[in-house]
């Protein structure tokens, strides 16, 4: 390569790196900041699955009472096309009955067991008396002013349409975010109702990471408004150490290193995209998330997170 060609190549590369760095720090030079209809620091996962039975009205009422900023819940659809709040399509884990929600009418759904495992807390269970699977419309009616984060659990066109209709009926486009880790589900949600903000699918999260590490992210427009990701390191506390291989531990470490990036979070939040990290249940995890620049934390223990935020901001 001639010295002239090398000079132009290095000049171009240098200009790209400088421009990328500047736009990473100041993205509004190129992109209009997204309007934030609400801001959520405190997010109750399944209503707070460590303090009440998950996805029940009792859980949601408790979370709202202590001041949560957002309820996170999961939706399925019954045989008679009722949108219900439940994490699992198959009810064996939660009710002890090996049936699918989609195979039953709403009136036929069995009640939750009185005690359920807390999915993101090892060797921990939660008890509760409210064991009824609620309808999504009940949640909307009970909490008209509370932001709600809806995980569309199955790729079902009727479910997506019904959820959209309920959001519109209760005038909640400005208080709702929906989507799933599945790319196709998120695309269908956006196509069904683009007025409801969407979250990043797993495929889009991986794309964002690729763009970030290559310096291209500052140049790319983003449609989504909510970047919801796990903190990979918490997997280590959920499993017995001796059951994990060295390669598994390395992959968790590497995933955490790549995903938990303050520069990435700062760039996204500067563009008006909220960053939520799930599912964190310990104070050191809360602190790490907020120190990294996360907008909000999703937890099974809303009371614990409320107390932390009170002390953290004091």
From Swiss-Prot:
Its EC number is 3.1.4.-. Residues 25-195 are cytoplasmic. It catalyses: a 1-O-alkyl-sn-glycero-3-phosphocholine + H2O = a 1-O-alkyl-sn-glycero-3-phosphate + choline + H(+); 1-hexadecanoyl-sn-glycero-3-phosphocholine + H2O = 1-hexadecanoyl-sn-glycero-3-phosphate + choline + H(+); N-hexadecanoyl-sn-glycero-3-phosphoethanolamine + H2O = N-hexadecanoylethanolamine + sn-glycerol 3-phosphate + H(+); N-(5Z,8Z,11Z,14Z-eicosatetraenoyl)-1-(9Z-octadecenoyl)-sn-glycero-3-phosphoethanolamine + H2O = N-(5Z,8Z,11Z,14Z-eicosatetraenoyl)-ethanolamine + 1-(9Z-octadecenoyl)-sn-glycero-3-phosphate + H(+). Widely expressed with high expression level in testis. One of its GO terms (cellular component) is membrane. Keywords: Cytoplasm, Endoplasmic reticulum, Hydrolase, Lipid metabolism, Membrane, Metal-binding, Transmembrane, Transmembrane helix. InterPro entries: GDPD-Related (IPR052271), GP_PDE_dom (IPR030395), PLC-like_Pdiesterase_TIM-brl (IPR017946). GO terms for molecular function: lysophospholipase activity; metal ion binding; phosphoric diester hydrolase activity. It is found in: Cytoplasm; Membrane; Cytoplasm, Perinuclear region; Endoplasmic reticulum. One of its GO terms (biological process) is glycerophospholipid catabolic process. Lysophospholipase D activity is increased by magnesium and manganese and inhibited by calcium in a concentration dependent manner. Loss of lysophospholipase D activity by addition of EDTA. Belongs to the glycerophosphoryl diester phosphodiesterase family. This is Lysophospholipase D GDPD1. It comes from Homo sapiens.
């Amino acid at each position: 390569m001639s010295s002239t060609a090398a000079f132009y190549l290095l000049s171009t590369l240098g200009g790209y790196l400088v421009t990328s760095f500047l736009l990473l720090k100041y993205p509004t030079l190129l992109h209009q900041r997204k309007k934030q209809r609400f801001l959520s620091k405190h997010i109750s996962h399944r209503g707070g699955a460590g303090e009440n039975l998950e996805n029940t009205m009792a859980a949601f009422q408790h979370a709202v009472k202590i001041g949560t900023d957002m309820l996170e819940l999961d939706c399925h659809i019954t045989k008679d096309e009722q949108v219900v709040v439940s994490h699992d399509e198959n009810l064996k884990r939660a009710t002890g009955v090996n049936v699918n929600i989609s195979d039953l009418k709403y009136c036929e759904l069995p009640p939750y067991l009185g005690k359920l495992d807390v999915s993101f807390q090892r060797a921990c269970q939660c008890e509760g008396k409210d064991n009824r699977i609620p309808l999504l419309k009940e949640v909307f009616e009970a909490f008209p002013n509370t932001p709600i984060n809806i995980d569309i659990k199955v790729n079902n066109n009727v479910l997506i349409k019904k959820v959209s209709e309920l959001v519109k009926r209760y005038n909640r486009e400005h208080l709702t975010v929906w989507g799933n880790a599945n790319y196709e589900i998120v695309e269908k949600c956006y196509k069904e109702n683009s007025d409801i903000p969407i979250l990043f699918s797993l495929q889009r999260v991986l794309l964002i990471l690729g763009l970030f590490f290559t310096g291209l992210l500052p140049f790319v427009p983003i449609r989504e408004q909510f970047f919801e990701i796990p903190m990979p390191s918490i997997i280590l506390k959920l499993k017995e150490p001796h059951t994990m291989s060295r390669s598994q531990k390395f992959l968790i470490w590497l995933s955490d290193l790549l995903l938990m990036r303050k520069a990435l979070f700062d760039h996204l939040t500067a563009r008006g995209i909220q960053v939520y990290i799930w599912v964190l249940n310990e104070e050191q995890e809360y602190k790490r998330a907020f120190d990294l620049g996360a907008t909000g934390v999703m937890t099974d223990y809303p009371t614990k997170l409320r107390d932390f935020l009170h002390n953290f901001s004091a």
